[in-house]
């Protein structure tokens, strides 16, 4: 069987990569990423898995006559945190898939 050794080696490499990626996924779940808006008046914290775990709103951000501004600040901070989480995930997991042509990675 020619090439059997290459296939076996490739399978070992894939298993090793899967193990490393699982470890990185676990680390990402523990990461905390903060997005802010309004000069820090609103801060949203997410995990590396993009789960919102904290929202902080400073008192001066709350204006009963302008609720829309507060909503916009919360959205902006959330989007910033999510984008940072995406970048971190790509950075952490991408190094394990470099050179591979895997759709979605």
From Swiss-Prot:
InterPro entries: YbaB-like_sf, YbaB/EbfC. GO terms for cellular component: bacterial nucleoid; cytosol. This is Nucleoid-associated protein SaurJH9_0500. The keyword 4Fe-4S does not apply. Residues 21-33 have a biased composition (Basic and acidic residues). Gene3D superfamilies: Nucleoid-associated protein YbaB-like domain. It comes from Staphylococcus aureus (strain JH9). Binds to DNA and alters its conformation. May be involved in regulation of gene expression, nucleoid organization and DNA protection. Belongs to the YbaB/EbfC family.
